């Protein structure tokens, strides 16, 4: 039988918010929960269907894949609608009902009807600060990150060498215990074995029964040219180890770009403030500016005013998703001279006098501004 559209299952629009999706799921789960419909196969199927839809649409990456490719874009085994029974109910509803039952929603492994389940390890995040030049050109580097690895003494079992884990007497190897409150009855992680289905009578002294030890490892990281602030680089399999033999999580290296002394980045474009002498602004000339690839020069026309912006095409950054480099925008600031000599003062006074004799043609903006002020007070 073909699967129904996940949005149709929850009864929400395709542009529904996360909160709307959660509310719709909660309503359906309360309506079709097996403990409220113990003899209804139809209710059981509706509950599984709603649970699968919620797990897909509440995850940003899975939802994006589903929106683009439909059911073919997501792994149906990740939905939890297969042979897990209802062992995943507490997982899916932990954030909604955790406060009702006094439990914290988390990633701890929960067992199912078929015994302890395997769980993928948690992802880790590493924050890396790089320069604008490194972001623009890319480079290879190494990072040292703390990591959990399998204990070499007990080979990950957590048990003292010569002994082995035993079946948990509390959950009888299931990894979960059932908890009831009012008309709700849900499965919780077993408090004795923490979801593994086994307990360790004689823990390994090296790892204290955890089966893993912490160590620092060195990883090679390739920073691609054009990366921007806030982007992440995925290092597959370098996260936390899995639970009950599950696959490890991933490490995400989050990039932060240091402020630059000259440039400000805006996407693929760069901006810089360039002071120029007032003589160059008045007479025009050639000025030289720095770029990430070296130096570049461009002509400044005579009569350039402070704040004028010049665009140098292709002198920005070629972003990760761009086929061409961005532009460099040079914002010129006309610099007023200071600490003048007497001779320089006299020359400027003569210059000022000549400007006054020339009238508005030398200072059109000033003339226009004074005219507006005059009309304002009339």
Swiss-Prot record:
Keywords: Chaperone, Cytoplasm, DNA replication, Metal-binding, Repeat, Stress response, Zinc, Zinc-finger. GO terms for cellular component: cytoplasm. The keyword Zinc applies. CXXCXGXG motif repeats lie at residues 151-158, 168-175, 190-197, 204-211. The keyword ATP-binding does not apply. Its cofactor is Zn(2+). One of its GO terms (molecular function) is ATP binding. Zn(2+) 2 binds at residues 168, 171, 190, 193. Its main location: cytoplasm. GO terms for biological process: chaperone cofactor-dependent protein refolding; DNA replication; protein refolding; response to heat. Binds 2 Zn(2+) ions per monomer. InterPro entries: DnaJ, DnaJ_C, DnaJ_domain, DnaJ_domain_CS, HSP40/DnaJ_pept-bd, HSP_DnaJ_Cys-rich_dom, HSP_DnaJ_Cys-rich_dom_sf, J_dom_sf. It is found in: Cytoplasm. Pfam families: DnaJ (PF00226), DnaJ_C (PF01556), DnaJ_CXXCXGXG (PF00684). Zn(2+) 1 binds at residues 151, 154, 204, 207. Residues 5-70 form the J domain. A zinc finger (CR-type) spans 138-216. Belongs to the DnaJ family. Homodimer. PANTHER family: CHAPERONE PROTEIN DNAJ, DNAJ HOMOLOG 1, MITOCHONDRIAL-RELATED. Participates actively in the response to hyperosmotic and heat shock by preventing the aggregation of stress-denatured proteins and by disaggregating proteins, also in an autonomous, DnaK-independent fashion. Unfolded proteins bind initially to DnaJ; upon interaction with the DnaJ-bound protein, DnaK hydrolyzes its bound ATP, resulting in the formation of a stable complex. GrpE releases ADP from DnaK; ATP binding to DnaK triggers the release of the substrate protein, thus completing the reaction cycle. HAMAP family: DnaJ (MF_01152). The J domain is necessary and sufficient to stimulate DnaK ATPase activity. Zinc center 1 plays an important role in the autonomous, DnaK-independent chaperone activity of DnaJ. Zinc center 2 is essential for interaction with DnaK and for DnaJ activity. This is Chaperone protein DnaJ. It comes from Burkholderia ambifaria (strain MC40-6).
């Amino acid at each position: 039988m073909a699967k129904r559209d996940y949005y149709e299952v929850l009864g929400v629009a395709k542009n529904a918010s996360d909160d709307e999706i959660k509310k719709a799921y909660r309503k359906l789960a309360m309506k079709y929960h097996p403990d409220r419909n113990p003899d209804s196969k139809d209710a059981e199927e509706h509950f599984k269907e709603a649970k699968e839809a919620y797990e897909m649409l509440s995850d940003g990456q899975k939802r994006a894949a589903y929106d683009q490719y439909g059911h073919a874009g997501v792994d149906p085994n990740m939905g939890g609608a297969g042979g897990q029974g209802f062992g995943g109910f507490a997982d899916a509803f932990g954030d909604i009902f955790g406060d009702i039952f006094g439990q914290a929603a988390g990633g701890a492994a929960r067992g199912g009807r078929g015994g302890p389940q395997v769980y993928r390890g948690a992802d880790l995040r590493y924050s890396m600060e790089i320069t604008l030049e490194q972001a623009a050109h890319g480079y290879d580097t190494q990072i040292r990150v703390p990591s959990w690895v399998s204990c070499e003494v007990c080979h990950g079992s957590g048990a003292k060498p010569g002994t082995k884990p035993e079946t948990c007497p509390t959950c009888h190897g299931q990894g979960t215990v059932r908890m009831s409150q009012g008309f709700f009855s849900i499965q919780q992680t077993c408090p004795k074995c923490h979801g593994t289905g086994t307990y360790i009578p004689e823990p390994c002294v090296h790892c204290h029964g955890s089966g893993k030890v912490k160590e620092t490892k060195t990883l090679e990281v390739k920073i691609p040219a054009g990366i921007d602030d806030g982007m992440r680089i995925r290092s597959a399999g370098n996260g936390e180890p899995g639970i009950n033999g599950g696959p490890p999580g991933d490490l995400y290296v989050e990039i932060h770009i240091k402020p630059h002394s000259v440039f400000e980045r805006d996407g693929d474009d760069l901006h810089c403030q360039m002071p120029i002498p007032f003589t160059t602004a008045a007479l025009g000339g050639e000025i030289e500016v720095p770029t990430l690839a070296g130096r570049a020069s461009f002509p400044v026309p005579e009569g350039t005013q402070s704040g004028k912006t010049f665009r140098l095409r292709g002198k920005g950054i070629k972003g990760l998703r761009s086929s061409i480099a961005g532009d460099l925008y040079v914002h010129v600031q006309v610099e007023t001279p200071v600490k003048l000599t007497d001779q320089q003062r006299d020359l400027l006074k003569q210059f000022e006098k000549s400007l006054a004799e020339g009238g508005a043609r030398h200072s059109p903006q000033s003339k226009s501004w004074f005219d507006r002020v005059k009309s304002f007070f009339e």
